[in-house]
Protein backbone atom coordinates (compact mmCIF):
# COMPACT_ATOMS: atom_id res chain seq x y z
CA UNK A 1 0.00 0.00 0.00
CA UNK A 2 3.03 2.27 0.26
CA UNK A 3 2.94 2.91 -3.49
CA UNK A 4 -0.72 3.90 -3.37
CA UNK A 5 -0.10 6.32 -0.50
CA UNK A 6 2.97 7.76 -2.26
CA UNK A 7 0.88 8.27 -5.42
CA UNK A 8 -1.75 10.18 -3.45
CA UNK A 9 0.97 12.30 -1.81
CA UNK A 10 2.51 13.08 -5.21
CA UNK A 11 -0.84 14.48 -6.40
CA UNK A 12 -0.45 16.99 -3.56
CA UNK A 13 3.08 17.83 -4.69
CA UNK A 14 4.72 15.80 -1.91
CA UNK A 15 7.02 13.39 -3.68
CA UNK A 16 8.23 10.22 -1.99
CA UNK A 17 10.03 8.33 -4.74
CA UNK A 18 11.52 5.98 -2.17
CA UNK A 19 8.00 4.67 -1.57
CA UNK A 20 6.52 5.36 -4.99
CA UNK A 21 9.33 3.51 -6.76
CA UNK A 22 10.64 0.85 -4.35
CA UNK A 23 13.93 -0.86 -5.09
CA UNK A 24 14.61 -4.52 -4.34
CA UNK A 25 17.24 -6.95 -5.53
CA UNK A 26 16.75 -8.64 -8.91
CA UNK A 27 18.81 -11.41 -10.54
CA UNK A 28 21.36 -10.85 -13.31
CA UNK A 29 21.38 -14.47 -14.53
CA UNK A 30 19.20 -17.51 -13.91
CA UNK A 31 20.81 -20.80 -14.91
CA UNK A 32 22.77 -19.15 -17.70
CA UNK A 33 20.01 -16.90 -19.06
CA UNK A 34 20.87 -13.21 -18.88
CA UNK A 35 18.10 -11.24 -17.20
CA UNK A 36 17.14 -7.66 -18.12
CA UNK A 37 18.44 -4.90 -15.89
CA UNK A 38 16.85 -4.22 -12.51
CA UNK A 39 15.08 -1.09 -13.76
CA UNK A 40 13.05 -3.17 -16.22
CA UNK A 41 12.16 -5.94 -13.76
CA UNK A 42 11.20 -3.38 -11.10
CA UNK A 43 9.00 -1.61 -13.68
CA UNK A 44 7.03 -4.79 -14.27
CA UNK A 45 6.73 -5.56 -10.55
CA UNK A 46 5.50 -2.04 -9.84
CA UNK A 47 2.83 -2.30 -12.50
CA UNK A 48 1.81 -5.89 -11.80
CA UNK A 49 1.52 -5.94 -8.00
CA UNK A 50 2.84 -2.69 -6.56
CA UNK A 51 5.35 -4.89 -4.71
CA UNK A 52 2.70 -6.94 -2.89
CA UNK A 53 4.11 -10.48 -2.62
CA UNK A 54 0.71 -11.90 -1.67
CA UNK A 55 -1.12 -10.29 -4.62
CA UNK A 56 -3.68 -12.49 -6.38
CA UNK A 57 -5.46 -11.24 -9.49
CA UNK A 58 -9.05 -12.01 -10.48
CA UNK A 59 -7.58 -14.12 -13.33
CA UNK A 60 -5.45 -16.18 -10.92
CA UNK A 61 -2.03 -14.53 -11.38
CA UNK A 62 0.11 -14.65 -8.26
CA UNK A 63 2.81 -12.75 -6.43
CA UNK A 64 5.08 -9.82 -7.20
CA UNK A 65 5.32 -10.50 -10.92
CA UNK A 66 1.74 -11.83 -11.19
CA UNK A 67 2.53 -15.19 -12.72
CA UNK A 68 -0.23 -17.54 -13.79
CA UNK A 69 0.46 -20.92 -12.11
CA UNK A 70 0.51 -22.77 -15.46
CA UNK A 71 3.04 -20.29 -16.91
CA UNK A 72 5.11 -20.41 -13.72
CA UNK A 73 5.23 -24.20 -13.95
CA UNK A 74 6.48 -24.08 -17.56
CA UNK A 75 9.03 -21.38 -16.76
CA UNK A 76 10.28 -23.29 -13.70
CA UNK A 77 10.94 -26.30 -15.93
CA UNK A 78 12.79 -24.15 -18.50
CA UNK A 79 14.81 -22.45 -15.76
CA UNK A 80 15.57 -25.80 -14.10
CA UNK A 81 13.96 -24.63 -10.87
CA UNK A 82 11.50 -26.62 -8.77
CA UNK A 83 7.87 -25.61 -9.14
CA UNK A 84 6.09 -24.92 -5.86
CA UNK A 85 2.82 -23.03 -6.35
CA UNK A 86 2.65 -21.78 -2.75
CA UNK A 87 6.03 -20.05 -3.14
CA UNK A 88 4.59 -17.75 -5.82
CA UNK A 89 2.96 -15.68 -3.06
CA UNK A 90 5.32 -16.37 -0.16
CA UNK A 91 8.84 -16.24 -1.60
CA UNK A 92 9.70 -12.95 -3.35
CA UNK A 93 13.01 -14.22 -4.74
CA UNK A 94 11.35 -17.31 -6.24
CA UNK A 95 8.59 -15.25 -7.88
CA UNK A 96 11.08 -12.70 -9.24
CA UNK A 97 13.36 -15.44 -10.58
CA UNK A 98 10.50 -17.09 -12.49
CA UNK A 99 9.03 -13.80 -13.74
CA UNK A 100 12.45 -12.48 -14.76
CA UNK A 101 13.27 -15.68 -16.63
CA UNK A 102 9.92 -15.49 -18.41
CA UNK A 103 10.21 -11.84 -19.50
CA UNK A 104 13.83 -12.41 -20.62
CA UNK A 105 12.60 -15.24 -22.84
CA UNK A 106 9.86 -13.04 -24.30
CA UNK A 107 12.37 -10.29 -25.09
CA UNK A 108 14.58 -12.82 -26.87
CA UNK A 109 11.59 -14.27 -28.76
CA UNK A 110 10.74 -10.80 -30.05
CA UNK A 111 14.34 -9.96 -31.01
CA UNK A 112 14.61 -7.34 -28.31
CA UNK A 113 11.34 -5.52 -29.00
CA UNK A 114 10.35 -4.51 -25.49
CA UNK A 115 6.82 -3.34 -26.41
CA UNK A 116 6.03 -6.81 -27.80
CA UNK A 117 7.52 -8.56 -24.77
CA UNK A 118 5.62 -6.33 -22.35
CA UNK A 119 2.34 -6.82 -24.22
CA UNK A 120 2.92 -10.60 -24.32
CA UNK A 121 3.67 -10.65 -20.59
CA UNK A 122 0.28 -9.04 -19.99
CA UNK A 123 -1.98 -10.52 -22.68
CA UNK A 124 -0.06 -13.56 -23.91
CA UNK A 125 2.16 -14.26 -26.93
CA UNK A 126 -0.74 -15.38 -29.16
CA UNK A 127 -2.43 -12.00 -28.83
CA UNK A 128 0.79 -10.20 -29.73
CA UNK A 129 1.13 -12.43 -32.79
CA UNK A 130 -2.41 -11.47 -33.82
CA UNK A 131 -1.85 -7.75 -33.15
CA UNK A 132 1.34 -7.81 -35.21
CA UNK A 133 -0.71 -9.27 -38.05
CA UNK A 134 -3.65 -6.86 -37.93
CA UNK A 135 -1.80 -3.72 -36.76
CA UNK A 136 1.23 -4.33 -38.97
CA UNK A 137 4.73 -4.98 -37.67
CA UNK A 138 7.17 -2.29 -36.49
CA UNK A 139 10.05 -4.75 -36.87
CA UNK A 140 9.30 -4.85 -40.60
CA UNK A 141 9.06 -1.02 -40.65
CA UNK A 142 5.35 -1.26 -41.55
CA UNK A 143 4.34 0.94 -38.62
CA UNK A 144 6.04 2.81 -35.82
CA UNK A 145 6.10 1.24 -32.32
CA UNK A 146 4.25 4.14 -30.71
CA UNK A 147 1.41 3.74 -33.19
CA UNK A 148 1.46 -0.04 -32.75
CA UNK A 149 1.04 0.38 -28.99
CA UNK A 150 -1.86 2.79 -29.55
CA UNK A 151 -3.56 0.18 -31.76
CA UNK A 152 -3.47 -2.59 -29.14
CA UNK A 153 -7.08 -3.73 -28.97
CA UNK A 154 -7.24 -4.23 -25.20
CA UNK A 155 -7.29 -0.97 -23.26
CA UNK A 156 -5.80 -2.76 -20.22
CA UNK A 157 -2.84 -4.09 -22.22
CA UNK A 158 -2.29 -0.81 -24.07
CA UNK A 159 -2.20 1.05 -20.74
CA UNK A 160 0.00 -1.66 -19.23
CA UNK A 161 2.64 -1.33 -21.96
CA UNK A 162 2.63 2.46 -21.62
CA UNK A 163 2.93 2.35 -17.82
CA UNK A 164 5.73 -0.25 -17.81
CA UNK A 165 7.75 1.83 -20.29
CA UNK A 166 7.06 4.93 -18.19
CA UNK A 167 8.11 3.12 -14.99
CA UNK A 168 11.22 1.84 -16.76
CA UNK A 169 12.36 5.35 -17.59
CA UNK A 170 11.77 6.53 -14.01
CA UNK A 171 13.66 3.54 -12.58
CA UNK A 172 16.53 4.10 -15.01
CA UNK A 173 16.76 7.65 -13.73
CA UNK A 174 16.54 6.63 -10.06
CA UNK A 175 19.08 3.80 -10.35
CA UNK A 176 21.50 5.30 -12.86
CA UNK A 177 20.70 9.03 -12.83
CA UNK A 178 20.05 8.84 -16.56
CA UNK A 179 16.79 8.29 -18.40
CA UNK A 180 16.77 6.07 -21.45
CA UNK A 181 16.33 7.83 -24.78
CA UNK A 182 12.91 7.10 -26.27
CA UNK A 183 14.42 5.79 -29.51
CA UNK A 184 16.08 3.02 -27.49
CA UNK A 185 12.75 1.76 -26.15
CA UNK A 186 11.88 0.71 -29.66
CA UNK A 187 15.06 -0.63 -31.16
CA UNK A 188 15.06 -4.19 -32.39
CA UNK A 189 17.74 -5.60 -30.16
CA UNK A 190 17.84 -6.13 -26.40
CA UNK A 191 18.89 -3.30 -24.14
CA UNK A 192 20.42 -5.88 -21.82
Language-model segments: residues:
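Catalytic glycan-binding domains that act on GlcNAc-containing polysaccharides
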Residues: 1-192
Amino acid sequence: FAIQIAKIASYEKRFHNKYNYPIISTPKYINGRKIPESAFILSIIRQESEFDISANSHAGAKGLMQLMPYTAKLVAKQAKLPYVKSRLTTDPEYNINLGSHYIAGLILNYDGAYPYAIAAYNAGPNRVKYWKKINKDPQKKQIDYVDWIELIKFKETRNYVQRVLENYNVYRYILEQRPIEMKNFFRDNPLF
